[in-house]
Amino acid sequence: MKTFVLGGGCFWCLDAVYQKTRGVSSVVSGYTGGHVRNPDYYEVCSGTTGHAEVVAVTFDETVVPEEVILDMFFALHDPTTLNRQGYDVGTQYRSSMFYTTTEEKVLFEEAIERAQALWSDPIVTEVSRLPEFHEAEEVHQNYYAKFPYQGYCQVIINPKLAKARKYYSAWLTA
């Protein structure tokens, strides 16, 4: 089993897709990359903690290759916009990848190279060593499954799920 910690805008979006990905055993929404210990959602949203909203995706690489997890990540958000995803603006929404080993760092850099071929603008994804990971509050875990009819889910997450189904259907469970 491997765990990648990835930030691509609001963590609810990545969580929704990875929850439906074959071989993924756990998706935990959280915060990392900042300077405040044990931040909460409101502190992170204030933009003063330096943290990014991220998901820790644990998966069986014999079922779903690392490259698929990473390529999905780059397909599901815009890695060329600095500190924003659509209407979500702030450093907490930055495109980011947090590694724990040199091997992961290399995998992340290779994924950026693959993704750059798909984008005309330069990719600005931050690649950093994982500092402390802070699990987000329970309401943010598996958010889409809890609140599928909430406005954000309908307008923002549903199109990302549709895109994942279009390009990664072989890797999705439903």
Curated annotation (Swiss-Prot):
Its EC number is 1.8.4.11. Gene3D superfamilies: Peptide methionine sulphoxide reductase MsrA. Keywords: Oxidoreductase. The active site is at C10. It holds the Pfam family PMSR. InterPro entries: Met_Sox_Rdtase_MsrA_dom, Met_Sox_Rdtase_MsrA_sf. One of its GO terms (molecular function) is peptide-methionine (S)-S-oxide reductase activity. It is an enzyme of class 1 (oxidoreductase). Signal peptide: none annotated. It catalyses: L-methionyl-[protein] + [thioredoxin]-disulfide + H2O = L-methionyl-(S)-S-oxide-[protein] + [thioredoxin]-dithiol; [thioredoxin]-disulfide + L-methionine + H2O = L-methionine (S)-S-oxide + [thioredoxin]-dithiol. One of its GO terms (biological process) is protein modification process. It comes from the Bacteria. HAMAP family: MsrA. Has an important function as a repair enzyme for proteins that have been inactivated by oxidation. Catalyzes the reversible oxidation-reduction of methionine sulfoxide in proteins to methionine. Belongs to the MsrA Met sulfoxide reductase family. NCBIfam families: msrA. This is Peptide methionine sulfoxide reductase MsrA. It comes from Paenarthrobacter aurescens (strain TC1). The gene is msrA.
